[in-house]
């Protein structure tokens, strides 16, 4: 079943996400789960277009997904079903995606870290507008007890999975 789905995605992935009409309310999303190595069906609500990405909301958890047009593998059908998976980038690519956004404004995001089978920890960060990478480090502000503290973060410390909020 999942291999058939993958062939369907590959055959149709060049369709533009902009084909989704603004009045679209709900859609099915087949999301690739990297931990379990298979696709699982998730229900998302399409919220809006913003800059160079689209915003979806998970109907069960209210978690928001920010999906870049250029990176979304998708299929849009008459039944308003999007068969896709959200790509988990390599660490350095995550950072440059964020830097692309901070040209115009501050960006707040969190990193969910689940390395070496340890329990997940959630770290909140903010990157200021027009931030640049210098000597493989970037100036970030991490949130602790509702306050932000300045810190330098190596671009190689970014994990594979990252969510912008």
List where the protein language model places each region:
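Intrinsically disordered, low-complexity, charged/polar segments
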Residues: 61-93, 146-165
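Short beta-rich binding modules
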Residues: 87, 94-95, 111-142, 160-161
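Terminal low-complexity interaction tails
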Residues: 1-7, 11, 20, 131-165
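Short coil-to-beta-strand transition motifs
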Residues: 34-43, 117-123
């Amino acid at each position: 079943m999942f291999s058939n789905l993958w062939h369907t995605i590959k055959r149709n992935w060049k369709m533009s996400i902009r084909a989704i009409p603004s009045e679209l309310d709900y859609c099915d999303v087949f999301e690739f789960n990297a931990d379990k190595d298979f696709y699982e069906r998730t229900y998302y609500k399409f919220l809006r277009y913003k800059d160079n990405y689209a915003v979806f909301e998970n109907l069960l958890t209210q978690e928001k997904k920010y999906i870049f047009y250029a990176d979304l593998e998708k299929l849009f059908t008459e039944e308003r079903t999007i068969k896709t998976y959200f790509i988990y980038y390599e660490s350095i690519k995550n950072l440059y995606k964020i830097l692309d956004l901070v040209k115009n404004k501050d960006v707040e995001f969190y990193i969910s870290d689940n390395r070496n089978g340890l329990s997940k920890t959630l770290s909140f960060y903010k990157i200021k507008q027009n931030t640049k990478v210098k000597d493989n480090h970037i100036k970030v502000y991490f949130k602790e007890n509702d306050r932000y503290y300045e810190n330098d973060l190596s671009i190689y410390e970014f994990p594979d999975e990252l969510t912008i909020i």
